[in-house]
């Protein structure tokens, strides 16, 4: 899917952003029938918070050599997971044995799918469940109780208690987009481990898209020989010599399915169709509409290639399904259905004749006919079709089809009203490729206004108020999606995913009455330490210190001092700072209010948790005149609105920077309120990026500037975006020039503070230009 974000607000607006049970319905579990926990339950280091916790007197100490007893394959597997998890997060070695003080048992008296009871007494610990999934969840809860702090390797006194727990929703999902940017099996296993720790149970693998086909299909070997590889787009000069891609063998995926199943996770494969099919058509042109062979796409967004809706295309999909069903034993098969622009079908005499012969009135109805065909094929084999909410648009959706609602919640509301099961996955709130803060060190992602912060994700309720009570039984749950156009490496994927996935996990597991964001933040502190033990580079964006200059930059330069307001997004922990650029410690001064700092100092600040450990890496604010007269791309905005993206220098860059705020529809960017009155000259650092965007019908919104030279110009205006140019710089030949450029010019005498606007007039058929940094030279 391609999701373009709206224009962002000023960075400072985001820095301080805080910040009687019924029987379970069809989509919900027994958790709704379990009483709320006692108030002191929130002090336990547990995410997600269990449905019910009863504290008891006493405790039981677990240390090296404590024995774990389990009988039956499921209990033994859960005990093995417990032992491995505790070894990693606490450094304690538990020992399996025929008997022991920690016991995992099957108990049919525990009611509800995935439910468990965890009992801690001075005599030992017992985990009981009626199914294997419940045993895994109980083991993960105990593992968290055994890692409450940073005392690695030390024994733990677990407080006596009884936990009765079960999930709020049956579908607690996470999507890994391995089509845009490939992820190794080892990376997926690491993600699965984290999902299990958070009691998520559905891993949605997006295995095909315009940019790549990722699963071995033996009947169609060119899907991976050709369709799994794309040539990275160029920003000028020769194309990269090495193609980008990869795929999974059937054996690898079967092994991954087993690995996930042991952790109570079902893998849901997605083959996207009839749109997002360019990799298929690149491999087998006869499966397209016109018979031409495109390249596997290097463009993000919406591309025109559709699957043939006739007998050839239908037979192909059924062949693929036959092989997928042998790999993935889960109930659901996802067949996409999103963003299929119908131009190719509309312009094909053959397709139009097919529609006429079958009495199909519209292209949307033709897509619905395909969905009905594949739904019947899957039902006959004991499976169920699930698709994105566009599968509703043509009408006649089979009752058995499940709808995943991404275009807000409207698809879920409509589908549940019509009697379909639904999964909530609305953009942008559950889209992890949206920025979680406006901190300048965030990697390239989709800007959101406001950012998709930890608190916003935590506050999302997967049961929309607009779904009528009689339809709520159709809500299976919800899913977060990590679309990977800009999530180019495991480190960036995990930065985007954690800790927001933990906030989401509590929303789909814990009963609504027990949830509280402040309590969640307290419980997140030990979870941050677990991620560090697991080598998961979770984002610290919610706790990182952001800076707001109180007043204008020009006023600070003129006065020789800066007044700074410090805050973190979550409004959590304590902020300590230094004024000499050194890293803050728990002994550093406590931030209690705005700081007035003589220019030339570097303020460095960190948020510390309740135990005195840092919750985020230090962030700095340089108060030198040079820094005050400089801005990075993150603070630039579109001159006249429009869609923005935060782009990497090259499409497949795996590092965290640089990042370029870009308006892909209008080549004009503005530094709002630039301190021009205290400057005499400017320098603009420019990056030349690949223009790799599939815009479909949105191409009509592209704004064209007439170039006065062969490759266009950078035009700088200092009196607002409609003012006269103060500098015009011809752009060099992209075929031979480097992809980072620098331009300098003088400001007219008497220039006052205002917007500094930079417009690129380069042809839309060539690369995309973006501003990396703007620097002003002080006038004195």
Outline where the language-model segments fall.
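Extracytoplasmic
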Residues: 618-780
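Bacterial N-terminal signal peptides
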Residues: 8-20
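Short, compositionally stereotyped local motifs that mark structural "simplifiers"
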Residues: 69, 515-652, 690-698, 722
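Contiguous, structured surface segment used for ligand recognition
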Residues: 28-171, 458, 492, 496, ...
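Flexible, acidic glycine-rich loops studded with aromatic residues
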Residues: 385-390, 395-401, 407-561
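Active-site beta-loop-alpha junctions enriched in small/polar residues
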Residues: 179, 208-212, 272-276, 338-340, ...
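Active-site neighborhood of glycoside hydrolase catalytic domains
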Residues: 280, 285-286, 295-298, 302-400, ...
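Feature activates predominantly on carbohydrate-active enzymes
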Residues: 111-332, 373, 377, 479-480
């Amino acid at each position: 899917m391609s999701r373009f974000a709206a224009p962002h607000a000023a960075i400072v607006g985001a820095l301080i952003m805080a910040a009687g049970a019924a029987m379970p319905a069809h989509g919900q579990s027994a958790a709704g029938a379990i009483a709320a926990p006692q108030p002191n339950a929130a002090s336990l280091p547990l995410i997600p918070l269990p449905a019910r916790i009863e504290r008891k007197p006493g405790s039981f100490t677990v240390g090296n050599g404590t024995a774990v007893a389990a009988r039956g394959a499921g209990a033994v597997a859960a005990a093995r997971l417990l032992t491995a998890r505790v070894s990693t997060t606490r450094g304690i070695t538990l020992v399996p044995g025929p008997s022991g003080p920690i016991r995992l048992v099957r108990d049919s008296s525990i009611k509800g799918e995935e439910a468990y009871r965890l009992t801690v007494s001075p005599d030992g610990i017992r985990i009981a469940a009626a199914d294997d999934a419940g045993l895994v969840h109980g083991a993960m809860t105990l593992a968290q109780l055994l890692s409450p702090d940073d005392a690695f390797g030390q024994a733990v006194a677990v407080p006596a208690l009884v936990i009765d727990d079960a999930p709020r929703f049956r579908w607690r999902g996470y999507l890994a987009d391995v089509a845009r940017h490939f992820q190794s099996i080892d990376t997926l296993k690491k993600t699965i481990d984290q999902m299990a720790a958070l009691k998520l149970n559905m891993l949605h693998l997006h295995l095909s898209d315009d940019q790549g086909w990722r699963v071995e299909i033996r009947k169609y070997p060119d899907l991976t020989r050709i369709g799994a590889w794309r040539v990275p787009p160029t920003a000028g000069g020769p194309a990269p010599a090495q193609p980008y891609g990869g795929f999974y063998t059937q054996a690898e995926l079967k092994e991954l399915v087993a690995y996930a199943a042991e952790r109570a996770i079902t893998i849901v494969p997605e083959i996207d169709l009839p749109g997002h099919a360019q990799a298929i058509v690149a491999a087998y042109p006869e499966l397209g509409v016109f018979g031409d062979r495109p390249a596997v796409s290097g463009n993000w967004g919406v591309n025109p290639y559709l699957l043939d809706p006739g007998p050839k295309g239908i037979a192909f999909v059924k062949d693929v399904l036959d092989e997928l069903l042998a790999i993935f034993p889960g109930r659901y098969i996802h067949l996409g259905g999103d963003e299929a622009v119908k131009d190719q079908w509309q312009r094909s005499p053959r397709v139009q004749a097919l529609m006429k012969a079958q009495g199909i009135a519209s292209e949307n109805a033709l897509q619905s006919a395909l969905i009905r065909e594949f739904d019947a094929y899957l039902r006959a084999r004991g499976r169920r079709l699930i698709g994105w909410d566009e599968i509703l648009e043509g009408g006649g959706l089979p009752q058995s089809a499940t709808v995943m609602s991404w275009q807000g919640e409207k698809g879920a509301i409509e589908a549940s009203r019509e009697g379909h099961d639904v999964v909530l996955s609305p953009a942008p709130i559950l889209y992890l490729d949206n920025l979680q803060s406006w901190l300048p060190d965030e990697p390239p992602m989709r800007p959101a206004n406001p950012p998709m912060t930890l608190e916003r994700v935590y506050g999302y309720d997967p049961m929309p108020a607009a779904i009528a009570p009689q339809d709520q039984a159709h809500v299976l749950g919800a899913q977060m999606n990590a679309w990977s156009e800009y999530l180019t490496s495991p480190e960036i994927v995990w930065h985007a995913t954690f800790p927001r996935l933990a906030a989401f996990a509590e929303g789909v597991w814990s009963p609504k009455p027990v949830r509280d964001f402040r309590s969640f933040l307290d419980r997140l502190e030990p979870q941050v330490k677990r991620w560090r033990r697991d080598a998961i580079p979770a984002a610290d964006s919610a706790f990182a210190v952001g800076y707001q200059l109180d007043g204008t930059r020009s006023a600070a330069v003129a006065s020789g001092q800066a007044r700074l307001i410090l805050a973190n997004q979550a409004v959590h922990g304590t902020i300590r700072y230094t004024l000499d650029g050194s890293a803050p410690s728990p002994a550093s001064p406590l931030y209690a209010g705005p700081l007035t700092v003589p220019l030339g100092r570097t303020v460095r600040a960190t948020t510390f948790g309740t135990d005195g450990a840092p919750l985020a890496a230090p962030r700095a604010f340089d108060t030198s005149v040079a820094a005050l007269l400089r801005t990075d791309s993150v603070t630039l905005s579109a001159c006249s609105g429009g869609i923005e993206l935060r782009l990497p220098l090259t499409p497949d860059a795996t590092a965290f920077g640089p990042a370029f705020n870009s308006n892909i529809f209008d080549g004009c960017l503005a530094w709002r309120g630039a301190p021009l009155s205290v400057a005499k000259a400017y320098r603009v650092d420019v990056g030349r990026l690949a223009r790799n965007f599939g815009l479909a019908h949105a191409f009509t919104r592209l704004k064209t500037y007439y170039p006065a030279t062969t490759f266009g110009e950078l035009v700088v205006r200092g009196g607002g975006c409609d003012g006269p140019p103060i500098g015009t710089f011809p752009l060099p030949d992209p075929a031979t020039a480097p992809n980072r450029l620098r331009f300098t010019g003088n400001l007219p005498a008497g220039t006052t503070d205002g917007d500094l606007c930079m417009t690129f007039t380069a042809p839309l058929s060539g690369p995309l230009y973006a501003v990396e940094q703007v620097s002003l030279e002080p006038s004195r």
